[in-house]
Swiss-Prot record:
Membrane topology: Multi-pass membrane protein
Extracellular topological intervals: 1-28, 82-99, 163-187, 259-260
Alphabetical UniProt keywords: Cell membrane, Disulfide bond, G-protein coupled receptor, Glycoprotein, Membrane, Receptor, Transducer, Transmembrane, Transmembrane helix
Species of the source: Homo sapiens
Localization of this protein: Cell membrane
GO biological processes: adenylate cyclase-activating G protein-coupled receptor signaling pathway; adenylate cyclase-modulating G protein-coupled receptor signaling pathway; cell surface receptor signaling pathway; feeding behavior; galanin-activated signaling pathway; inositol phosphate metabolic process; learning or memory; muscle contraction
Membrane-spanning intervals of the chain: 29-49, 61-81, 100-121, 142-162, 188-208, 238-258, 261-281
Family named by the database record: Belongs to the G-protein coupled receptor 1 family.
Disulfide bonds: 98-175
Gene Ontology CC terms, in alphabetical order: cilium; membrane; plasma membrane
Name assigned to this protein: Galanin receptor type 2
Length: 387
């Protein structure tokens, strides 16, 4: 087997057994192929939904977009190469990719963890201080934060460009750690602290305070409003994504800590644990689109619309478009818009009715004919694509 991945894996082939047929040489690449397929399709759809119609204009959407970019880069640039360490006897991709692949693994891992920490702070400010945080929670500041995220990610992952190198080992060309053990241990500890421990602490603190505020709101009217329900929905979705990140990357970091500070003998059992930690951590890059599809009605509609367009079918029911008279504009995240008072009232109506004037609640309705008279002055027309 090829030598790559976590510290202490230098004798992975010996741990996996001698000659003969290795089941992991078939099973693991198939699982990596599944991760690659689901992750590529899912994250591409997420980016398409957010970019379609200029919807990535809120701070939350920009952070979700950045998370999708990091996951897609990881899937495309890392997973195919890492899958070969269980099938090929040596590293066949050259010295440059030996360094670049591992650098990209840690670059995207840092970017994902920093993005989740940033979006947790964004959700806390949006819910706890909705008015005072408006000047801070702007698309421009979100883009600046994303730039800072990638800058810090480059800073912390840059040393991995020299951490690994291609060399000859037992008549095989392998890609393995080149640093001395003390330097590798210091680097791995720094990676654990800055890419996992600190972001997890930020996530835990912000979401604990956010959930406490949401579920202990003293104003029953505000607590039952559509805006509050929308904020709860988007917070729940981001919380699930953050929890999955913590759980999926935990085995990877636990294994590394065991290598440096515990007992990690090279046996078939520890070899299986190493494979499992790889699969679980890499699978994190393909689960987020599944979470979005399960939690967000907007993403489900967007996925169906894009897939229907690719298949050459007209998406939607009946006319495929609906109209609504709404006062003002909506600038929140995709989840907040879909859970706004407008949509809650339309669902409660149970049937489609003509759009009333501005003095009455607005209900989604089929697009009327030319004889329909528009809303009064001061109202605006909101056109919604229905998948």
């Amino acid at each position: 087997m090829n030598v790559s991945g976590c510290p202490g894996a230098g004798n992975a082939s010996q741990a996996g057994g001698g000659g003969g047929w290795h089941p992991e040489a078939v099973i693991v690449p198939l699982l990596f192929a599944l991760i690659f397929l689901v992750g590529t399709v899912g994250n591409t759809l997420v980016l398409a939904v957010l970019l379609r119609g200029g919807q990535a204009v809120s701070t939350t959407n920009l952070f979700i977009l950045n998370l999708g970019v990091a996951d897609l880069c990881f899937i495309l640039c890392c997973v195919p190469f890492q899958a070969t360490i269980y099938t090929l006897d040596g590293w066949v991709f050259g010295s440059l990719l030996c360094k670049a692949v591992h650098f990209l693994i840690f670059l995207t891992m840092h970017a994902s963890s920093f993005t989740l920490a940033a979006v947790s702070l964004d959700r806390y400010l949006a819910i706890r201080y909705p008015l005072h945080s408006r000047e801070l929670r702007t698309p421009r500041n979100a883009l600046a934060a994303i730039g800072l995220i990638w800058g810090l990610s480059l800073l912390f992952s840059g040393p991995y460009l020299s951490y690994y190198r291609q060399s000859q080992l037992a008549n095989l060309t392998v890609c393995h750690p080149a640093w001395s053990a003390p330097r590798r241990r210091a680097m791995d500890i720094c990676t654990f602290v800055f890419s996992y421990l600190l972001p997890v602490l930020v996530l835990g603190l912000t979401y604990a305070r956010t959930l406490r505020y949401l579920w202990r709101a003293v104003d029953p009217v505000a607590a039952g409003s559509g805006a509050r329900r929308a904020k709860r929905k988007v917070t729940r979705m981001i919380l699930i994504v953050a929890a999955l990140f913590c759980l999926c990357w935990m085995p990877h970091h636990a294994l590394i800590l065991c290598v440096w500070f515990g007992q990690f003998p090279l046996t078939r059992a520890t070899y299986a644990l190493r494979i499992l930690s790889h699969l679980v951590s890499y699978a994190n890059s393909c689960v987020n689109p599944i979470v979005y599809a399960l939690v967000s009605k907007h993403f489900r509609k967007g996925f169906r619309t894009i897939c229907a367009g690719l298949l050459g079918r007209a998406p939607g029911r009946a006319s495929g478009r609906v109209c609504a008279a709404a006062r003002g504009t909506h600038s929140g995240s995709v989840l907040e818009r879909e859970s706004s008072d407008l949509l809650h009232m339309s669902e409660a109506a149970g049937a489609l009715r003509p759009c009333p004037g501005a003095s009455q609640p607005c209900i989604l309705e089929p697009c009327p004919g030319p004889s329909w008279q528009g809303p009064k002055a001061g109202d605006s027309i909101l056109t919604v694509d229905v998948a």
